[in-house]
Amino acid sequence: MCGIVGIVSSEDINQQIYDSLLLLQHRGQDSTGIATMEESMFHIYKAKGQVSTAYRTRDMRNLVGKVGLGHVRYATKGSAESIEEAQPFYVNAPYGIVLIHNLSLIHI
C-alpha cells in the first residue's frame, strides 16, 4: 500500500504535491519522494520517514516545475531502510523517465 499523487498545472506545483502527500501519509510512512519537471529537466528528492520531517525549505525550493509526482511508501517488499527503494525512480535512457508505482512485480 502506497500513496501516489500527480499534478499538471500552469503554476509551480511543489507545495501542492507536498500538501497532497501529507493527506496521503496514512498510506505509507517508510519513505517519501517528489519529482518535478521544469522544461526538460527533472528535479527529484527522496527521503526515509514521514512527509512532515522529510522535506526542508531548501529541498522544496529545488523542486521547481509545473508537472510533478509524489509518493509515500509502505514497504511490503524490499527494505524499508533503503533510500534506493524509495520512489520516484529515475532512469536516464534513452531520454529520461520518472516512474512511481503501487504494485508488486513477480516473475517478470
Identify the function of each model-found stretch.
Residues 106-108:
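Conserved small/polar residues in nucleotide/adenosyl-binding loops
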Residues 1-102:
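N-terminal glutamine amidotransferase
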